[in-house]
């Protein structure tokens, strides 16, 4: 089993931390192999940001994501930039408040994409009180929608990765993201 995951958005959304959490969840807590890479523009906030994670039950011979099984798009620009790379039959998770969904309906149908809506920024604000944890809302949605890492592993990785004193809010955001999928944000 090899799963390629790309999480993309813009600087300031916590895309890189989301990738780190996912990689740690797989490798440290689920006993899988994982490689995480990242890229971002020169801007501190607002520029393009991308984290990629390869998860496998075997040693990973090539660490780059070429055709992701899972794409998490936290901005419309990220969606437009990376959606064509998504494997046919893959999984697409978007923040519907940040993308123009009617522009991708044909793509989703033609490529037989499993499509999930996770209004991460709004959910972070409404359920946790701060938008900065929108990335953990997306990790919760990703975990629930795909099962690529276990809930326990994701929670442990979050606790191990976020700044001290913010663990509870980040776990709340993670749970809120899971609930979005359980409640049928499809």
Swiss-Prot record:
EC number: 1.2.7.3
Gene3D superfamilies associated with the record: Pyruvate-ferredoxin oxidoreductase, PFOR, domain III
Classification via InterPro entries: 2-oxoglutarate_synth_KorC, PorC_KorC, Pyrv/ketoisovalerate_OxRed_cat, Pyrv_flavodox_OxRed_cen
Thermal activity characteristics from the UniProt entry: Optimum temperature is 70 degrees Celsius.
Pfam families with a match to the protein in the record: POR
Keyword Transcription included in the entry's annotation: no
Biophysicochemical property: pH dependence: Optimum pH is 9.0.
Catalytic reaction(s) noted: 2 oxidized [2Fe-2S]-[ferredoxin] + 2-oxoglutarate + CoA = succinyl-CoA + 2 reduced [2Fe-2S]-[ferredoxin] + CO2 + H(+)
Name recorded for this polypeptide: 2-oxoglutarate synthase subunit KorC
Originating organism: Methanothermobacter marburgensis (strain ATCC BAA-927 / DSM 2133 / JCM 14651 / NBRC 100331 / OCM 82 / Marburg) (Methanobacterium thermoautotrophicum)
